């Protein structure tokens, strides 16, 4: 089933920008729930780029960056998952002591609120990679760029996994 939703079409336009699409999915907090979720992605040939899992007593929220967010959201909805899509910032920082604090100070000093973040791996030496959820993507991208920290768009991210 193809989703013919104007909102999704606009959200998933293939424009080049400096954000990536993160899919957040509610999972029941029980043994095997994450395995079932990832099995669905595997069967659909969806490749995970980043994953974060936060839990509460009754449910968990899994946040994923995937190679094909449009197809993934369709598949998950068809499988009955409650999910949402958020634009987040992926960044490349130097893999050395102090690089993370430099980035965090740049954001904090410029009054950019970091709501959450998580790391991911890519095939590039001497670099570390993070996903950032901030209150104002545009402002954060400007601050990061001015401080020599490179935001990564979806296309850049895909090239790192080839």
Indicate where each model-derived feature is located.
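Targeting/processing segments of secretory and organellar proteins
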Residues: 1-2
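A conserved regulatory-domain signal marking ACT and ACT-like small-molecule sensing domains
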Residues: 11-162
């Amino acid at each position: 089933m193809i989703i013919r939703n104007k909102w999704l079409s606009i959200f998933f336009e293939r424009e080049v920008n400096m954000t990536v699409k993160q899919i957040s999915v509610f999972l029941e907090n029980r043994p095997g729930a994450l395995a079932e979720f990832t099995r669905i992605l595997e069967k659909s040939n969806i490749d995970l780029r980043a994953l974060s899992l936060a839990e509460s007593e009754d449910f968990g929220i899994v946040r994923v960056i995937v190679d094909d967010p449009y197809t993934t959201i369709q598949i998950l909805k068809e499988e009955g998952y409650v999910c949402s899509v958020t634009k987040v910032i992926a960044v490349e920082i130097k893999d050395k002591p102090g690089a993370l604090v430099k980035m965090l100070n740049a954001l904090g000093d410029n009054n950019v609120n970091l709501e959450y973040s998580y790391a991911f791996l890519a095939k590039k030496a001497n670099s570390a990679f993070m996903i950032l959820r901030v209150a104002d993507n545009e402002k954060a991208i400007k601050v990061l760029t001015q401080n020599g920290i490179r935001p990564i768009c979806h296309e850049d991210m895909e090239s790192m996994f080839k």
